Each structure stands twice: as C-alpha cells, then as structure tokens.
C-alpha cells in the first residue's frame, strides 16, 4: 500500500518503511510526525481526497535533522570583480512507520 502525502509545499509518494528527505520540520530526532494524505492506492482502486482523505493516516519518525550538500553561486563581471556565495538547504529525514487506510 502506498500514499501520496503533502508537506512543505511538495507531494511525496511513500510506503511503509521508506526514508524520505523533506523540507525542514520542527521536532527532535526520534519524534513522531503525521502527514496530510492526498491519495491512497495499492489495493484495488486508488482513493483520492478532495483535497485530503479523512480517516487515513501516515505516521513517521524523525531520523535526522541535517543540511543538503552546499550549492555554490559564483558571479564574475568583466570589470574584474567576483562574488562567491554558498547555500545549504536544511532538511528532515523521516522514516515512514505506518500507512493506515
């Protein structure tokens, strides 16, 4: 059974046991999180919510709070100046523990 969840302005297709890197969530490592479920499928026909499904839950456990690999932004002008900036986007890694329909 799989589900499509919404978090951080994005949608993810998850199943029980999946590890997903999502936009940063408030919470400590080992904490529990619940997600809005948009679609459930895998057994017969898929159920689609309008916009979410009532009575369907997807629970996860926070495994890590970290940052992605650094992205470098480099600008150079012909006048001779350069500008180098970096950015590391924070994320939360979640282990999907249950998908209940």
Curated annotation (Swiss-Prot):
The keyword Membrane does not apply. GO terms for biological process: translation. GO terms for cellular component: cytoplasm; ribonucleoprotein complex; ribosome. One of its GO terms (molecular function) is rRNA binding. It comes from the Bacteria. Keywords: Ribonucleoprotein, Ribosomal protein, RNA-binding, rRNA-binding. SUPFAM superfamilies: L21p-like. Part of the 50S ribosomal subunit. Contacts protein L20. Belongs to the bacterial ribosomal protein bL21 family. This protein binds to 23S rRNA in the presence of protein L20. This is Large ribosomal subunit protein bL21. It comes from Anaeromyxobacter sp. (strain K). The gene is rplU.
């Amino acid at each position: 059974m799989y589900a499509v969840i919404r978090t951080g302005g994005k949608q993810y297709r998850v199943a029980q046991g999946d590890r997903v890197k999502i936009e940063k969530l408030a919470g400590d490592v080992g904490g529990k999180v619940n997600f809005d479920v948009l679609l459930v499928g895998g057994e017969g026909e898929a159920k689609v919510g309008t916009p979410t499904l009532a009575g369907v839950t997807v629970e996860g456990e926070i495994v890590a709070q970290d940052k992605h690999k650094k992205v470098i932004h480099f600008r150079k002008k012909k006048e001779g100046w350069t500008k180098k900036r970096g950015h590391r986007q924070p994320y939360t890694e979640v282990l999907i523990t249950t998908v209940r329909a």
